[in-house]
A protein has these predicted regions:
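Residues at the C-termini of beta-strands that transition into short coil/loop
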Residues: 117
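Beta/alpha (TIM)-barrel catalytic core signal, keyed to glycine-rich beta->alpha loops juxtaposed to Asp/Glu
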Residues: 120
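Aromatic- and glycine-enriched glycan-recognition loops and surfaces
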Residues: 40-49
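Surface-exposed amphipathic alpha-helical tracts and adjacent flexible/coil segments at the periphery
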Residues: 1-22, 26-37, 51-52, 58-86, ...
Length: 399
């Protein structure tokens, strides 16, 4: 069984750092004006390249969102954005507009294509159509039940990705016009004002009767992985880095069988709307799915809790185990080779080694120095060391 991907949101470089150092396999973020979270910090220009390089140096993939509807008058800007993304070396594009799909195929034909949840494709026929169009992955709607997800996984010709934690819209993603009608800020243009979180009342309701609790299916990740989900997505490009770190940590723990009530409590404290819901997944629709941000939800993230997750991502995480080969011979330049995965680098000294004057340079000392990888993406694996020149002085030769 292929290991399922942990896909984390990155609305800022600090959030991206939190995702990567907490153990995400991939991150997703927007660039420019053509993504569903235009109010996030996002990445553009040099920041885009810096973000992609940061991730790739740590063996983390980058999925970039171009998941809004684009006007004809914006085609020049769109093409420039696609060229910039293609040049950056990003791994995949998440798309909504089929017109954007055509532009991407013309400019960057080799990049992987993912169908955004904004496309509202939740049927097998729809997924097969996406495959025919060239998509290699579809992001499933949040509104599907576990039986529907299982059926799609068993029959889909392409990879399937699903949200396992984060906000739920009152409407199906990609189909809502409420924000556009009430304030001329369209969700399909990346500018949703979230009017469903405002006080709308129905008879015998809560006073916030369009506001759903956040989804949380992290505890079901092992089951969903066996079902065939390829990627578990965390919503939250507008959330703080500590939230990202906590969600990635919880998901990682779940997939390794170490998920606990502490993970759930931490997530609820960092952000919730009166708790979480599994309503759609369990096909248990009803009033318990609704909730809003009450005062205790806003103030529950204590300084100690924030610091707990800040500590996780403030230090560099070792990704590569390095094998060293060191050769010190009297008639050759010193050679040091470092190998990790499929990469190998060899450096040579500028001159031949000189005999030690005060003390010998031993294998033990060389090993001690090679093990100093702290604060980098590397960790010491093992070493083959050959040192033939050990004597401190001529006097040592006489002993």
């Amino acid at each position: 069984m292929i290991k399922a991907e942990i896909l984390a949101p990155a609305g800022s470089f600090e959030a991206l750092t939190a995702a990567v150092r907490s153990g995400a396999d991939a991150v997703y973020f927007g660039t420019g004006n053509f993504n569903a979270r235009r109010n996030a910090s996002n990445f553009s220009g040099d920041d885009l390249q810096r973000a992609v390089d940061f991730c790739h140096e740590r063996n983390v993939k980058v999925h970039i969102t171009l998941n809004t509807l684009v006007k004809d008058s914006e085609m020049s800007e769109l093409k420039e954005s696609v060229r910039r993304i293609c040049k950056s070396g990003a791994d995949a594009l998440i798309l909504q507009d089929l017109g954007v799909l055509r532009v991407v195929k013309d400019i960057c034909p080799d990049i992987e294509l993912h169908a955004s949840t904004q496309m509202s494709v939740g049927t097998l026929d729809g997924i097969r159509t996406l495959a025919d169009l060239g998509f290699s992955r579809a992001v499933l709607p949040r509104e599907l039940s576990k039986d529907e997800i299982k059926y799609l996984c068993e029959n889909s010709p392409i990879e399937l990705e699903m949200f396992v934690h984060g906000a739920l819209c009152m409407c199906v993603s990609g189909q809502c016009l409420l924000s556009a009608f009430l304030g001329s800020r369209s969700g399909n243009r990346g500018l949703c004002a979230q009017p469903c979180r405002l006080p709308f009342a129905a008879e015998n309701g809560t006073g916030h009767d369009l506001s759903l609790k956040d989804l949380s299916l992290i505890e079901y990740a092992p089951i969903l992985s066996k079902t065939g989900i390829s990627s578990f997505k965390i919503e939250g490009r507008m959330k703080r880095p500590e939230y990202v770190a906590a969600a990635v940590t919880a998901l990682k723990n779940s997939l390794s069988g170490e998920y606990s009530s502490e993970n759930s409590e931490d997530l609820c404290s960092l952000f919730s709307r009166s708790g979480f819901t599994k309503g759609y997944y369990e096909n248990a629709l009803g009033r318990n799915m609704f909730g809003f941000r009450e005062k205790e939800n806003v103030t529950s993230a204590t300084a100690s809790l924030l610091k707990k997750y800040e500590r996780i991502y403030e230090k560099e995480r070792a990704v590569y185990r390095v094998h060293f080969v060191l050769s010190v011979k009297s008639d050759k330049k010193i050679s040091l080779t470092a190998s990790a995965n499929d990469l190998s680098v060899t450096i040579l000294s500028e001159s031949l080694p000189q005999k030690a004057v005060n003390r010998p340079f031993t294998k033990e000392e060389a090993l001690l120095r090679l093990k100093k990888c702290g604060g980098t993406v590397f960790s010491f694996g093992d070493a083959d060391i050959c040192i033939c020149l050990l004597y401190t002085s001529d006097a040592a030769d006489d002993k």
